[in-house]
Swiss-Prot record:
<comment type="subunit">
    <text>Heterodimer of HisH and HisF.</text>
</comment>
<dbReference type="GO" id="GO:0016829">
    <property type="term" value="F:lyase activity"/>
</dbReference>
<dbReference type="GO" id="GO:0000105">
    <property type="term" value="P:L-histidine biosynthetic process"/>
</dbReference>
<dbReference type="InterPro" id="IPR029062">
    <property type="entry name" value="Class_I_gatase-like"/>
</dbReference>
<keyword id="KW-0456">Lyase</keyword>
<protein>
    <recommendedName>
        <fullName>Imidazole glycerol phosphate synthase subunit HisH</fullName>
        <ecNumber>4.3.2.10</ecNumber>
        <ecNumber>3.5.1.2</ecNumber>
    </recommendedName>
</protein>
<comment type="pathway">
    <text>Amino-acid biosynthesis; L-histidine biosynthesis; L-histidine from 5-phospho-alpha-D-ribose 1-diphosphate: step 5/9.</text>
</comment>
<dbReference type="GO" id="GO:0005737">
    <property type="term" value="C:cytoplasm"/>
</dbReference>
<dbReference type="Pfam" id="PF00117">
    <property type="entry name" value="GATase"/>
</dbReference>
<feature type="domain" description="Glutamine amidotransferase type-1">
    <location>
        <begin position="2"/>
        <end position="216"/>
    </location>
</feature>
<feature type="active site">
    <location>
        <position position="198"/>
    </location>
</feature>
<keyword id="KW-0963">Cytoplasm</keyword>
<keyword id="KW-0368">Histidine biosynthesis</keyword>
<keyword id="KW-0315">Glutamine amidotransferase</keyword>
<dbReference type="GO" id="GO:0004359">
    <property type="term" value="F:glutaminase activity"/>
</dbReference>
<feature type="active site" description="Nucleophile">
    <location>
        <position position="88"/>
    </location>
</feature>
<dbReference type="InterPro" id="IPR010139">
    <property type="entry name" value="Imidazole-glycPsynth_HisH"/>
</dbReference>
């Protein structure tokens, strides 16, 4: 199995690659973790990971700048139904639009917009930086065996914007930061996380292992 982590100039690429290699090794999964900017290698991969940090518009421009990458993603994820994971802004790009400073079109895979977080508690600072628990809204194999909820493990977040999904069924999990904030989305063969599994220690490694084993 070959897992393509897309290098388009954004994301914690080294830590993501290392986390996927470690999760595969510790779970006894035979997987080649391929950090690549080659659209053809993405198109032929068994699983695809789209990381991302920074501004939505910058990440979209970076993705568009890689020849054939958006086309490869649409073909491989939507038509060939290969398992896909978006991380942080990589998840946000799954949406229809980003509303950060300007309106930027996303990939349009998950109905909804990415908008600025406005916590109900004014003492909560933006961006949300640090550890927070996640609460699963819809059961999904990606969370199998992972303690969640009030007594669960913590995930690591760094973000100022959130995906406001139009369909509640697409929201797999939330976190509480002055109100519910989308922590994970999923539909068909695609999932995305606002938190960083590559930085989320035990929860993150278990999550990555579940993604590698997932058969949508």
């Amino acid at each position: 199995m070959r897992v393509a982590i897309i290098d388009y100039g954004s994301g914690n690429l080294r830590s993501a690659t290392k986390a996927f290699e470690r999760a595969a090794h510790e779970s006894g999964i035979s997987a080649e973790i391929d950090l690549t900017c080659d659209a053809q290698r993405v198109a032929s991969a068994d699983r695809i990971v789209l990381p991302g940090v920074g501004a939505y518009a910058d990440c979209r421009r970076g993705l568009d700048a890689v020849p054939g990458m958006v086309e490869a993603l649409n073909d491989t994820v939507l038509k060939k139904a290969r398992p896909f994971l978006g991380i942080c802004v990589g998840m946000q790009l799954m949406s229809e639009r980003g509303l950060e400073k300007t309106v930027t079109n996303g990939l349009g895979w998950i109905a909804g917009d990415v908008r600025e977080m406005v916590p109900s508690d004014a003492s909560l600072k933006i961006p949300q930086i640090g550890w927070n628990r996640i609460h699963v809204k819809h059961s999904h194999p990606i969370f199998d065996g992972i303690p969640t909820g009030d007594d669960g493990l913590h995930a690591y977040f760094v973000h100022s914007y959130m995906l406001d999904a139009k369909n509640a069924s697409d929201v797999l999990a939330v976190t509480d930061y002055g109100g519910d904030v989308t922590a994970a989305v999923g539909r068909d063969n695609m999932v995305g996380t606002q938190f960083h599994p590559e930085k989320s220690q035990l929860l993150g490694l278990s999550f990555i292992a579940n993604f590698l084993k997932w058969k949508p």
